[in-house]
Amino acid sequence: MSLWGGRFQDGSSAMFRTVNDSLPFDRVLASQDIRGSIAWARAIAKAGVLNQDEHQQLEEALKALLVKADAGELDFDASSEEDIHSFVEATLIEQLGDVARKLHTGRSRNDQVATDFRLWTREHVDLLVEDVEAVIASLVGNADVNQDVILPGYTHLQRAQPVRYPHWCLAYVEMLKRDLSRLHDLKARLNQCPLGSGALAGTTYPIDRQAIAEELGFDSPCINSLDAVSDRDYVLELLFVASTSMMHLSRMAEDLIFYNSGEAGFIQLGDAVTSGSSLMPQKKNPDALELMRGKCGRVFGSLQALLVTMKGLPLAYNKDMQEDKEGLFDATNQWHICLRIACEVVDSIKLDSERCAKAAREGYANATELADYLVDKGIPFRTAHDISGRVVLDALEKKKAIEELTIAELKVYSDVIEEDVYPVLQLEYLVNKRDILGGTGIKPVLEALANAKASFKK
């Protein structure tokens, strides 16, 4: 059933239908489209467009259709309709005849699809919030059972300073908390109702738009009809949040891939989230993490595609905007998948605490501590930094750790160095001395972990 055929003498070509028809993907919006139509039927009944009997017939048919939609029982594949809107309307007309032909009075597909899409996006924001919180809970849980593990911290992928493993976990918790904040912020801007905006200029019928908005769970109606049907900022915002969060997951995946490598060997991943090689029997590959990292680019692409699509569009609706859906559907689906597999990966992690500690002691990670020791003895930091660097060079040439150098060897560089330097150079001292808010000392880490546990329990 065409919604716009009266002005045309010829039908659409098969190729045009291939380009134009959106039912193959916007069928995802079936439940939202039907809920919007239920609200619209009530609104036009109050406006006098439908009598009581007509409204009752429509509402009963729509509610029955909604049950089928929610159960996944609608037969889209047998339909030749253009989009989800014509599919629903054609189904109603088949059941009710001319009564169903009144449903679209005062409404355009422009405000209809904008409403459907906002409803769908709002629902998925709520699901994504749950998924992000689940990853946070997994990280917090893994940190909690590994409080005493110390491993190297890196800059430039070179060992820099030792950190507690929970401190590493909580770094990603902070990133994911920002993702949650962005999702909540987005929802506040998203939650306005376009229905009643018509094609672009509003409707001539006395529709109570505030009542429609409240019925559909929106905070308010959109206040400008042109903007209401043209706006896809909420799609772009969700794609941006998805891209940012996927970037966080990708960085975490990269860390864990390295930690899991034979070169580091800090962690082992469970069999359930790894795979083998068809040729090399010994391999246990971190494929879940690699796919998480790889899917990041796919989500980035959806954001870039819609930005480019929207940048040159005049007001109001243009068919280019039909390209908003597949990218968001795919990006949010990939994000859902990656968040859920991230939980499984984190839950599977087993740490080799001895190997972590050994690596943390290597690489002269205590060189900064030596410089700080010299500062405590009254030497200016820049001078102390230079002295510590020369001590590292000497230790490298002698193939020793700094703490393995004798007092005589150390005093070559500064007379203030005494036996009390050796405790300062020990791993636990290096970590616990950073006992400041946000640091990797035991006290701030345990406080941060306790706060996270209170907010994000499994």
UniProtKB/Swiss-Prot annotation:
UniProt-listed Enzyme Commission number(s): 4.3.2.1
Pathway(s): Amino-acid biosynthesis; L-arginine biosynthesis; L-arginine from L-ornithine and carbamoyl phosphate: step 3/3
Chief location: cytoplasm
Domain of life: Bacteria
UniProt record, GO biological process: arginine biosynthetic process via ornithine; L-arginine biosynthetic process
Alphabetic keyword roster: Amino-acid biosynthesis, Arginine biosynthesis, Cytoplasm, Lyase
Subcellular location: Cytoplasm
Protein name listed in UniProt: Argininosuccinate lyase
Organism: Pseudoalteromonas atlantica (strain T6c / ATCC BAA-1087)
Organism phylogeny: Bacteria, Pseudomonadati, Pseudomonadota, Gammaproteobacteria, Alteromonadales
Protein encoded by which gene: argH
